[in-house]
Amino acid sequence: MSNKKVIKLIKLQIPGGKANPAPPIGPALGAAGVNIMGFCKEFNAATQDRPGDLLPVVITVYSDKTFTFITKQPPVSSLIKKALNLESGSKIPNRNKVGKLTQAQVTAIAEQKMKDMDVVLLDSAKRMVEGTARSMGIDVE
């Protein structure tokens, strides 16, 4: 890949194992000239062990219309909703609380998300998770 020139970076959030050519994937990749079905098959094969998780993916498109992609960990808000079995956060976060997150859950989420965060210390990652939880209307014990 030393001579290939990067022409576009595409960032999407796609449920694991459920990529299909429908919007938003099709139009984003079609505009870059990428083989849409080729991407969908590769992505679904790579993420079949994480069905239903909303996965951020960064697709790098090269000048010869080939591509590579990197999947990341699900967003913190998705991990919190999954841990508490919630559909969504509170509409009014400072008034209506929709759940409680224990320190053990905060630590587990922070450890899972650490490699995608720009932090070195686990305590910093935990504070980021706690802040996201508070903005969703979730109390942190």
Swiss-Prot record:
Q: Which UniProt keywords apply?
A: Methylation, Ribonucleoprotein, Ribosomal protein, RNA-binding, rRNA-binding
Query: Can you quote a single GO CC term?
Result: cytosolic large ribosomal subunit
Q: What are its GO biological-process terms? A: translation
Tell me, how does this one assemble? Answer: Part of the ribosomal stalk of the 50S ribosomal subunit. Interacts with L10 and the large rRNA to form the base of the stalk. L10 forms an elongated spine to which L12 dimers bind in a sequential fashion forming a multimeric L10(L12)X complex.
Which SMART domains does the record associate with it? RL11
Q: Family per UniProt?
A: Belongs to the universal ribosomal protein uL11 family.
PTMs per UniProt: One or more lysine residues are methylated.
Identification of the protein by name: Large ribosomal subunit protein uL11
Organism lineage string: Bacteria, Pseudomonadati, Chlamydiota, Chlamydiia, Chlamydiales
- Organism this protein belongs to: Chlamydia caviae (strain ATCC VR-813 / DSM 19441 / 03DC25 / GPIC)
| UniProt xrefs under PANTHER family | 60S RIBOSOMAL PROTEIN L12 (PTHR11661), LARGE RIBOSOMAL SUBUNIT PROTEIN UL11M (PTHR11661:SF1)
GO molecular function ontology, one term from the record: structural constituent of ribosome
